[in-house]
């Protein structure tokens, strides 16, 4: 990388990370005094593996719904275009350990679901493109590596 780019993740050397992990991707201090922290919640090793779209889509719906049972600080949970993880945006200063606990609790909730929340054409733009089973498999794999989440670099 010759020069610093505007997008934080474009400055991350994806060949040097060891997924899965949770890391602070950005912190914004807003004019009114609030702080937003964006976390990179990485499920898959970049350029080696990825989540299939139905898994991504069901993880997005399930996590977004379940996480709000545990925290009012969640702003958004959205997928990365590369399909290797998600961005979790929260109100507050960075707290990787606390966020890892929140992610763990939420993924455990997802394992208990029978269906993907709002996976229908009334509540979703592509209601047929879901797989709760694939989402749960990805959640299970992520949870199996829980002790590694705070170690980002290989």
From Swiss-Prot:
Positions of transmembrane segments: none
Any matching Pfam family: LuxS
Q: Entry's InterPro entries?
A: LuxS_sf, Metalloenz_LuxS/M16, S-ribosylhomocysteinase
SUPFAM superfamilies xrefs: LuxS/MPP-like metallohydrolase (SSF63411)
Q: What class of enzyme is it?
A: lyase
User: What EC number(s) would the UniProt record show?
Assistant: 4.4.1.21
Report the co-factor binding details.
Binds 1 Fe cation per subunit.
**By its UniProt entry, which NCBIfam families does this protein fall under?**
PRK02260.1-4
Q: Which HAMAP family match?
A: LuxS
What quaternary arrangement does the UniProt entry report?
Answer: Homodimer.
Q: What name appears for this protein in its UniProt entry?
A: S-ribosylhomocysteine lyase
Species? Cutibacterium acnes (strain DSM 16379 / KPA171202)
Annotated gene = luxS
């Amino acid at each position: 990388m010759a020069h610093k780019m505007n997008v934080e993740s474009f400055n991350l050397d994806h060949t040097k990370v060891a997924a899965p992990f949770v890391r602070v991707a950005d912190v914004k201090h807003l004019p009114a005094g609030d702080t937003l922290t964006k976390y990179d919640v990485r499920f898959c090793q970049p350029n080696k593996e990825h989540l299939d779209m139905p898994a991504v889509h069901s993880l997005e719906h399930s996590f977004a719904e379940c996480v709000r049972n545990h925290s009012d600080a969640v702003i958004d949970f959205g997928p990365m275009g590369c399909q290797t993880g998600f961005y979790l945006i929260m109100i507050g200063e960075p707290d990787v350990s606390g966020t890892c606990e929140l992610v763990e609790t939420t993924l455990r909730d997802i394992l208990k679901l029978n269906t993907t929340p709002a996976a229908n054409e009334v509540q979703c733009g592509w209601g047929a493109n879901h797989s709760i089973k694939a989402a749960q498999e990805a959640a299970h794999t992520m949870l199996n590596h829980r002790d590694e989440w705070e170690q980002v670099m290989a």
